Amino acid sequence: MDQRPELLSSMEYVASPDPKPGVPLRVAENVAPGAEDWLPSASGHLAWATSLETEHQTHLELSEEQRLQISKELVDLQIATHHLREQHEAEVFELRREILRLESRVLELELHGNGACQGHKVQPMANLGQHQVPPLEPPGGQQKLQEELKWLLEHHRARQQALETQVGVLSQQLQGAREEARTTGQQLASQAMVLASCKGQLRQAEAENTQLQLQLKKMNEEYAVRLQHYARETVENASSTNQAALQAFLESTLQDIRAAHRTREQQLAQAARTYRKRLADLNQRQELLLTTCRATFATAINLEPLPMHWATELSHPRENEYGRHRTLLLYPEKGSGETSKENKSQPLALDTASWAQIQQRLQDFSQDTQAELERERAQLMVRATMAEQQLSELQEYVDQHLGRYKQEILKLRKLVNIGDPQGVEAVSSPGSGGARL
């Protein structure tokens, strides 16, 4: 019962794809130039997409835990089967040694009996009454040994049947574990289909978000035109007596712009923290995956060689055993030589062939597992590099906008301190940029 391919098939599902950490940034890149200033208004759609990704990522993590648990159960079943086989082989060896001891005892008694019979024939008939040799062996000694040998054979047959029953139960459990692994694979495939459909919905939501951002841009341009018009009217209607009211209006406008800038900074800082957290989570999951695969592979390597063709080994040796013992009972001298030759040649050839085949399978399994781990490590490294690039771009984006906001605030402060009513027209250009936020 070779279970190495099943171990390989159960490990093929260790790795699963994560939602790409660059989705929020891709939404910002699809917007027309200058549209990144309107991202706060689309936070609801972005939060919905993020929650959808988190939910499906949780399902994928659960399926990974199920696959690891099934792989562990398969390895435990294989170890239990191996221990049972070792116990069976030890009992068979003890029984064979006991049979050989009894065979040697029978041969020894037969030789003594034959020698005693020949000695009695040579002696004169006159000395039979004076000096009679006592029999060396009781009349029923050989029959008793044969009965004991038959009892040992029956006991061995019963033990072998019990071990076959245990092996059958373990085989059924292993088949159930394989069915469970197949069911888990089907569930994973269905979850992958659901994830693909959710990705389609996410792309549709991104398209809708882009359209909403374009509409927001048009509305901001319209409001900027209105603000410019209202500023001109205010300058035209302002007089020396209304200078204080104009300054109060400019102060309130400046406070609104500062509040918008502060909100924008908080949103960008939150996005940067989210990217850092996702990058750390990705690195942690990579380390956990590599550790789990390494532990499973080490457990598989530490297993001792198992005998091949177990079903054939359970059926044919029994018939050979009965034939050999029948030969021993009928021809004791012929049976002892054949028994010693079989015990020396057959296990040695079987162990050598089994060990060579298992060593080849372990080597193939190690090469395939190593190649798969290398591919997965390369993919994770690429994803980590992409996440770092996106994080650096986001940091640069935050620094650039903070610098621009500071320049706009300085310009507005200069205009308020000067108190020039004609400078209100210059407020329209930075004010429109603040309104877009």
Curated annotation (Swiss-Prot):
GO terms for cellular component: centriole; cytoplasm; deuterosome; perinuclear region of cytoplasm; sarcolemma; sarcoplasmic reticulum. Residues 83-114, 147-287, 360-408 form a coiled coil. Its main location: cytoplasm. The keyword Repeat does not apply. One of its GO terms (biological process) is cell projection organization. It is found in: Cytoplasm, Cytoskeleton, Microtubule organizing center, Centrosome, Centriole; Cytoplasm, Perinuclear region; Cell membrane, Sarcolemma; Sarcoplasmic reticulum. Keywords: Cell membrane, Cilium biogenesis/degradation, Coiled coil, Cytoplasm, Cytoskeleton, Membrane, Sarcoplasmic reticulum. It holds the Pfam family DUF4472. The keyword Coiled coil applies. It comes from the Eukaryota. Belongs to the CCDC78 family. Component of the deuterosome, a structure that promotes de novo centriole amplification in multiciliated cells that can generate more than 100 centrioles. Deuterosome-mediated centriole amplification occurs in terminally differentiated multiciliated cells (G1/0) and not in S phase. Essential for centriole amplification and is required for CEP152 localization to the deuterosome. This is Coiled-coil domain-containing protein 78. It comes from Mus musculus (Mouse). The gene is Ccdc78.
